Amino acid sequence: MFQLQNYALGEWVEGTGPKTDLVHAVTGEKIGETSSHGLDFKAMLQYARRVGGPTLRSYTFHQRALMLKRVAIALMERKEEFYPLSSMTGATRTDSWVDIEGGIGTFFAYASRGRREFTNERFHVEGPTEPLSKHGTFVGRHILVPMEGAAVHINAFNFPVWGMLEKLAPALLAGVPCIVKPSTTGSHLTHAVFKAILDTHELPKGALQLICGEARTLLEHVEEQDIVAFTGSAATGQKLKAAPSIMAHSVRFNMEADSLNCSILGPDAVPGTEEFDLFIKEVTREMTSKAGQKCTAIRRSIVPAGLEEAVIAALSKRLGSTTIGDPTVEGVRMGPLASRGQVKSVASSAEAIRAAAELVYGGGDFAVVGADREKGSFFAPELLYCADPLTRLEPHDIEAFGPVNTIMPYRDLGEAVQLARMGRGSLVGSLVTHDPKVAQEVILGAACYHGRMLVLDRTSAKESTGHGSPLPNLVHGGPGRAGGGEEMGGARGVTHYLQRVALQGSPSMITAITREWTKGAEETQDSVHPFRKTFDALQVGDTLITKSRTITLDDVEAFAKLSGDTFYAHMNDEDARSNGVFEGRVAHGYFVVSAAAGLFVDPDLGPVLANYGLEKLRFTKPVYPGDTIHVRLTVKQKTAKDTPEGTIPQGVVEWDVEVINQHDEPVAVYSILTLVRRGEAVPVTPQAA
């Protein structure tokens, strides 16, 4: 029997007063209880802001990313502990894999992105420098800094692990402490994974808190620096979003709500094609995976008029082979709903849809393997058919959050798009077609009503992640009924927990704040070549002005012969003049870059270990034989790298390169990246206190 405690103010706390029962979805038996009565929600928010926040913000993005990675590794080592707990929610092994290992995967994904897409700083510089004055003495730049409040995460019952981890990953990477409020249904699984995270001792005090029971007055205490992220029904989300405290303090509220997602069968995908079979397989999977309890599940199947009978027959056959029962029994492909309350809710919603649709599959007795159908929360798949979906709104307005799907016909692509849009905003829509013209018309016609759209055909099917799978590197959310919010999406998900600030000032001031050299800022020159300096000795703004080199016609011809690039503008004076761009034969741009390297590189063995990249290259003016060039090389940014045991301590130095001609005009501008030896290893992520 689980006695679920809450985790508040750095301690496990058992709720007082009446408790809520936790029930096994398969057997109907009580498996535990929990309560949040007695918790001081205001104190929990203050603890997160005053204890967890300052410590998390003292870490750099890279340190927080490594923290996530170590937590993810630890959770993967313990993953098998969570599968039996997941089966109690009605999830099959496959369902649980998506929830458990998919959730842990978001931590791995954000750990990787945190080190690749953010610098090793406590803030993030966004976008290019914006010139704001004629002479360059006044410029602008955007930076992102962590919000100094707490993130309140209110999660749904259908994914107890993924629902928690997909919100925690970007928030913790941003440096914001979190209070997790899972649905009480299934909270025994959330509780176990949460405790496993604490067992790693990777997170600092105050970084995480957990409420297993009701949240009651929690949102009454949020303030302007807090963030609320909600996943659940549209009705509940809209009610919470309108809370007086949310409105009064303009609290960021990200809402991801269940929606009437659709899948469209293209007119080319007739029976006998691979695409028709893919459509049948995808709709069936979305109806039976998690017993249809997914916010991304297909609720509306939009098919060409005339193919309804074929689609109904194929879906009925495939659904008929789906074994329902105890998910721990071998061969069972679909488990029960999460609770008896869900059974009543789904049945009621399906009945309401049937006011506009005919039941064409399901609805009668069904067999259950390894369990008692009356005691468990079982509900068999149902297929409905709406013959007039343009005038009957029930299938577009009512969601049965379970294995229920409504088939509806369209006469042309314009009508298919119209039906897709009638969901009034969806998390995801899919189109099954092998015709690029169909894909273009449908996707561009329906895109503004969707957060994500999948085009599925024979080419992508083998590797496709499917209609219902949100991915950490793509946005998850949708307009309108879907909540109007957005989660994940790679670095975008992190920015929801950061404040964007527009900076204005002189280039030197902006450089001092961002620690990234801005053109026009002060430069430092000395007698030591910058390639002779270690990473630690180099300073942002260190600059080398090279000697000059005059480019000759022999240089151009030699480079053409060596590279094989004999483009006419380099080799024929008359042809070069004829194109209206050049005044005559012009040097290869890549020769200019190579010649520039010859001017600024120090060739001897030293701290520079390797050149591993060139970015943002632009050729701003032609270089003709007889022109003389030199280079201004400036340290633009430094990023210390983590130093695994046995490797050379190093960091990445980004250099601003400007190649200049004899008229003091830039002819090429770009950045190069070098690995430079450090004097000492980078400290590992600070350990939790």
Predicted regions and their residues:
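ALDH superfamily catalytic-core signature
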Residues: 200-201, 225-227, 235-390, 412-414, ...
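N-terminal Rossmann-like NAD(P)+-binding subdomain of aldehyde/semialdehyde dehydrogenases
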Residues: 1-136, 183, 321, 338
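Catalytic strand-loop segment that frames the active site of acyl-thioester-processing enzymes
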Residues: 526-587, 678
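Short, well-ordered beta-strand elements within core beta-sheets of diverse protein domains
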Residues: 18, 31-37, 53-57, 131-132, ...
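HotDog/MaoC-like acyl-thioester-processing domains
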Residues: 530-540, 623-689
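Hydrophobic beta-strand-centered segment that forms part of the acyl-chain substrate-binding groove
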Residues: 578-587, 591-637
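Rossmann-like NAD(P) dinucleotide-binding subdomain of oxidoreductase/dehydrogenase enzymes
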Residues: 118-278, 410, 463, 485
